[in-house]
Amino acid sequence: MRSKLIEKIFRDTAYVRMGGTSEERRVAEYIRDVCAGLGGEAQFEEFEVDMADIKRAELYVDGKKIECRGYMCCGSGELFAELYYLASDDKRALAACRGKIVLIDGYLGYWKYRDLLANGAVGFITYDGNVNYADRDIDRRELRSYVSQGEKILGVNINAKDAVAIVNANGKYVRMIVEQDEYKGKSQNVVLEIPGETDEIITFTAHYDSTSLSQGAYDNMSGCVGLLSMAEYFIGRENRRTLRFIWCGSEERGLLGSKAYCAAHEEELEKIVLGINIDMIGCIMGGLTSICTAEMRLVNYLSYLGDEIGIPVHAVQEIHSSDSTPFADKGIPTASFCRRAPMGTATIHNSYDTKKLIKTDNMKSDIAFITAFAERMINAVNCPVDRTIPDNMKEKLDEYLLRKRKK
């Protein structure tokens, strides 16, 4: 793909596009139109997502109002309770949550939420941002349905600066108000198929949604551009295997697009011999990495291929928190590609993820490697990757997908 078109796509999509919103739909339509311009005909596959309109979100600590954003889908109501800062996850610390509104560090995942409920917490406060950054941005977060399992307590998100100030001042009592209208909305995957000589399928995935503060250039319009570039390359060629490009919606909300795709196409998943995923490439710093949820032979092959074509790649056997994982969980070997930026050189899920993080030459280099790998897999007489998931990866899939708690 020409550099000017790559840069134009980044410019045209430089806005927030949370899963299930009209902005996400707008980008889906844009991707479909770009596909048409390349000679392909993409289709929408819609799926249902939880949505909420926050009408009111207020937080007071010892009478002082703290700027906050209410958690989507946590319910509505008003609380007054003692504040408790959960600085440790050990049993004694958790036992002190009973009857309290609990301030927690880090992300509110499934197991932490279950611990809060089991120990009698009545509400929660999370925080994000960085005390060293000038902004006071607050991310919009949600209590995901697979986390709550229908058991909801009120929650808000605040800026890290306020969290530190609250703990430093030994905050005692909290009043929390959240009012919202919860409903079902629509997100969509954008799917383009390029028929091959056989009915074996290789899937290509990249998500196009962003988080609530982010333009999502690095995470993950870069991956979307990668897929568009590869579609441009393979359209009109004679390909041994069928190619299916899937721009996934609502990845940032829990891999919802790729999960929906696998659920809707259960009967034909056995035809998919390999999944290739792109999530965050082309940044200025760092090097190309491939995360393979597959046999070690694929890991070694990618390392050798990097030497062969002169584009270094660091390949590892691991689970990737991206749209490759639902496919791997269905027994499909996957290779996910990213360029991991060193600490302090690029950041995601905030307002700093813009086109400024991207270097077009690195985009083209990363895409060239992924395309070279894909072409070999597409046209191999027999797909060289065993269609199996090793036991050690199955164990990690169980942990990642919350079927088993990590020890």
Regions inferred by a protein language model and the residue ranges of each:
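Soluble metallo-hydrolase cores and metallopeptidase-like ectodomains found primarily
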Residues: K64-E67, Y71-Y85, D89-K91, D139-A217, ...
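Metal-dependent peptidase/peptidase-like ectodomains
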Residues: D199, C248-T347
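Alpha-helical metal-binding/catalytic segments enriched in His/Glu/Asp
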Residues: C35-A36, G106-Y107, L117, E200-L255, ...
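Noncatalytic luminal/extracellular "stalk/propeptide" segments of secretory-pathway proteins
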Residues: S3, E7-R98
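N-terminal capping segment at the start of a domain
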Residues: M1-E23, L38, N132-S145, D209, ...
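Acidic, glycine-rich active-site loops and adjacent beta-strand->loop/helix elements
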Residues: Y107-L108, N130-V131, Q180, Y208-S210, ...
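Second-shell loop/turn segments in exported
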Residues: A14-S22, L103-Y107, E151-I153, V178-E179, ...
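His/Asp/Glu-rich mid-to-C-terminal helical/loop segments that flank catalytic regions of hydrolases
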Residues: E232, G344-K407
